[in-house]
A protein has these predicted regions:
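Short hydrophobic/aromatic beta-strand or adjacent loop that forms the aromatic wall/cage
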Residues: 1, 79, 151-155
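Conserved beta-strand and immediately adjacent loop positions that scaffold enzyme active sites
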Residues: 81, 90, 176
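Conserved Nudix-box catalytic region and its N-terminal flanking loop in Nudix hydrolases
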Residues: 85-123
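Acidic, metal-coordinating catalytic segment for phosphate/diphosphate chemistry
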Residues: 35-81
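Active-site beta-strand termini and strand-to-loop segments that position acidic
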Residues: 84-87, 158-160
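Unchanged
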Residues: 107-195
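Nudix hydrolase/Nudix homology domain
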Residues: 2-4, 12-17, 25-30, 99, ...
Length: 206
């Protein structure tokens, strides 16, 4: 199963055995293998009714094959970030554009994706973290210079000393960053992106 977020709307790719319970805000689509999948991202962007489109993977295709067809008409960028915990279990979060987020950024040419994750955490927060295990990939869209972009972000668990000093990268629009206790986490997650919630959920499973 794979989710792509269009702001607070969601496109889910799944097999027959993974189809979630259908509700009023969910639409299930059973496409033929020759369907024009490349139009779906633009349909998600333009529709005022679609909140959650569930796209069943045709029997003749793999998830990867469907994803390639789906994204054939958009530019895909790769990025990476970290879910950083200190020795007391507090999480590192940043505040940018009025939303709480996790440090992340675009992969540089020739750079290993795990190196991207560590570099971006250090640049955006000032925290020197230690790399842990891979957690998950998230996908989300945005518009840039009139073009629809899909960003794939690879997330890693990371570790840092207790209350490690942090400094927001203000030139990237980050207003503040710091360590969040479990007691304050729900408050922050009430004002974050759906993909960030997915990262925390993935960490609970690993």
């Amino acid at each position: 199963m794979l989710d792509i977020y269009f702001k607070h709307r969601k496109l889910t790719l799944c097999g027959k055995e993974e189809i979630p319970v259908i509700a009023d805000d969910r639409f299930l689509m059973h496409p033929a293998p020759d369907y024009n999948f490349s139009q779906i991202p633009y349909m998600m962007e333009s529709s005022i009714y679609l909140r959650h489109l569930i796209l069943e993977i045709p029997d003749e295709m793999t998830e990867e094959e469907l994803l390639q067809k789906l994204l054939s008409g958009v530019k895909v960028l790769k990025a990476a970030g970290g879910l950083v915990q200190d020795e007391e279990g507090k999480h590192l979060m940043i505040y940018r554009n009025g939303v709480w987020d996790l440090p992340k950024g675009k992969q540089e040419e020739g750079e290993d994706i795990s190196v991207t994750a560590l570099r971006e955490v250090q640049e955006e927060s000032g925290v020197e973290a230690t790399l842990g295990e891979f957690l998950t990939d998230t996908w989300h869209t945005y518009w840039l210079d009139g073009a629809l972009i899909v960003k794939k972000t690879s997330w890693y668990r990371m570790f840092a000393p207790k209350d490690a000093p942090s400094k927001p990268q203000t030139e990237e629009g980050i207003e503040k960053c710091g360590w969040v206790t479990d007691e304050d986490l729900d408050y922050r997650l009430a004002n974050t992106y759906p993909s960030v919630i997915d990262v925390f959920e993935s960490a609970k499973k690993n």
